[in-house]
From Swiss-Prot:
<keyword id="KW-0521">NADP</keyword>
<feature type="binding site">
    <location>
        <position position="107"/>
    </location>
    <ligand>
        <name>substrate</name>
    </ligand>
</feature>
<keyword id="KW-0627">Porphyrin biosynthesis</keyword>
<keyword id="KW-0560">Oxidoreductase</keyword>
<dbReference type="InterPro" id="IPR000343">
    <property type="entry name" value="4pyrrol_synth_GluRdtase"/>
</dbReference>
<dbReference type="Pfam" id="PF05201">
    <property type="entry name" value="GlutR_N"/>
</dbReference>
<feature type="active site" description="Nucleophile">
    <location>
        <position position="47"/>
    </location>
</feature>
<feature type="binding site">
    <location>
        <begin position="101"/>
        <end position="103"/>
    </location>
    <ligand>
        <name>substrate</name>
    </ligand>
</feature>
<dbReference type="InterPro" id="IPR006151">
    <property type="entry name" value="Shikm_DH/Glu-tRNA_Rdtase"/>
</dbReference>
<dbReference type="Pfam" id="PF01488">
    <property type="entry name" value="Shikimate_DH"/>
</dbReference>
<dbReference type="GO" id="GO:0050661">
    <property type="term" value="F:NADP binding"/>
</dbReference>
<feature type="binding site">
    <location>
        <position position="96"/>
    </location>
    <ligand>
        <name>substrate</name>
    </ligand>
</feature>
<comment type="similarity">
    <text>Belongs to the glutamyl-tRNA reductase family.</text>
</comment>
<comment type="function">
    <text>Catalyzes the NADPH-dependent reduction of glutamyl-tRNA(Glu) to glutamate 1-semialdehyde (GSA).</text>
</comment>
<protein>
    <recommendedName>
        <fullName>Glutamyl-tRNA reductase</fullName>
        <ecNumber>1.2.1.70</ecNumber>
    </recommendedName>
</protein>
<feature type="binding site">
    <location>
        <begin position="46"/>
        <end position="49"/>
    </location>
    <ligand>
        <name>substrate</name>
    </ligand>
</feature>
<dbReference type="GO" id="GO:0019353">
    <property type="term" value="P:protoporphyrinogen IX biosynthetic process from glutamate"/>
</dbReference>
Length: 390
């Protein structure tokens, strides 16, 4: 029997942002409604995709997404092995906006957890998502699909690590208190940086960000003082003019590394001409990101090989699952037939008689099941149908 899984969804590849916003499912209200509409299913809803996975016909899932203002051209529908293959590609990071990004694996895990909490899973979906999560872990541990920085903030951290190796003894100055500064500090804190100095035009914003990451806050007038204390400067402030020029960096005993990720730039390019200063800008970081993306692309065939192996493993499990269903039905049928044939027999005799009756059928099912998965109707399906009519 063909695998009865289905997937209905939309993603950054098929729908613009405003459509994805309409389709996104809030976990408190909209997600339970979606699972209720599906009966049994798992919903994966992120900023870049909303996908409904279930067993049987995809029509209810399709109707649910259309009811949220999605038009048919934005949807994709996959069934059987193709639905499972898509789930595996998603969990491995191959279908992400940035190939190999790690966040999606946690989102797949969360989707399964929420479906379980609603009582919306069943055996095929459980196995599909459990195997997808295991595959995602293998893809990241056995290939380089998740290696290297592919965001500007992480590329800046990679550059700092390449220069210093250990960040624990460093004083790092961050210019700006916006989203990019926050993202960089998140990465920085995870690597155990020694001292964080946050400088911003509005000192209150600097204080709020510094408190989050255990740093010190300064207003813009204190920038010259901060520069004298820093080993590394990362600039991401919104400013219409340069905040740091050659005149702000008098000669010093140890070199100063500066990474300018602001646009417009915060640091005068002439700073890079100073013998004691090493300046990197967005173009330098973009080259790092592009190189890492090319390296990840080279790992895709390895991940696809893992996916095909996982598909084979799942289909082998599914063959056994179908046989187990048929065996249970056969055993129940055999007990009924034995009781009809020997109404005076006791429980032990009836169980033995039922076993003798069912045994040859069970052996035949086990021999033929694996050869039939995904092809024409299996012997066990015919038996299940016939037994349901007796």
């Amino acid at each position: 029997m063909a695998l009865p899984l289905y997937l209905v969804g939309l993603s950054h590849k098929t729908a613009p942002l405003e459509v994805r916003e309409r389709a996104a499912l809030d976990p408190v209200v909209a997600l339970p409604a979606a699972l209720s509409a599906l009966g049994k299913g798992v919903v994966l809803s992120t900023c870049n995709r909303t996908e409904l996975y279930g067993v049987g016909s995809p029509e209810k899932a399709r109707a649910f997404l259309l009811s949220r203002g999605v038009v048919p051209r934005h949807l994709y529908v996959k069934e059987g092995v193709e639905a499972l293959r898509h789930l595996y590609r998603v969990a491995a990071g191959l279908d992400s906006l940035v190939v190999g990004e790690a966040q999606i694996l946690g989102q797949v895990r969360e989707a399964l957890f929420l479906a379980r909490r609603q009582g919306a899973t069943e055996s095929l979906l459980e196995k599909a998502f459990q195997s997808a999560i295991a595959l995602g872990k293998r893809a990241r541990s056995e290939t380089g699909i998740g290696m290297g920085a592919v965001s500007v903030a992480y590329a800046a951290l990679d550059l700092a690590l390449a220069v210093y190796g250990d960040l624990s003894g460093l004083s790092v100055a961050v210019l700006g208190a916006g989203e990019m500064a926050e993202l960089f500090l998140t990465h920085l804190k995870a690597h155990g940086v020694g001292r964080i100095l946050v400088v911003n035009r509005t000192e209150e914003k600097a204080q709020a960000l510094a408190e989050r990451f255990g740093g010190e806050a300064f207003g813009l007038p204190a920038l010259p003082q901060v520069l004298r204390q820093a080993d590394l400067v990362v600039a991401s402030a919104a400013a219409p003019h340069y905040l740091v020029g050659p005149e702000d960096l008098p000669k010093r005993a140890k070199p100063l590394f500066l990474i300018d990720i602001a646009l417009p730039r915060n640091i005068d390019p002439r700073v890079g001409d100073l013998p004691h200063a090493y300046l990197y800008n967005l173009d330098d970081l973009k080259r790092v990101v592009d190189r890492n993306l090319r390296a990840r692309a080279g790992e895709i065939p390895k991940v696809e090989a893992l996916i095909e192996k996982a598909l084979g493993d799942y289909m082998e499990w599914y063959a056994g699952h179908r046989v187990r269903e048929a065996i249970r039905a056969l055993e129940a049928w055999a007990r009924v037939q034995a009781a009809k044939a020997q109404p005076e027999a006791g429980p032990v005799e009836l169980e033995k008689a039922a076993g003798r009756l069912a045994h040859p059928f069970i052996l035949g099912l086990k021999r033929r099941a694996l050869d039939r998965v995904g092809g024409p109707p299996c012997p066990e399906d015919c038996l299940l149908y016939r037994l349901s009519r007796t």
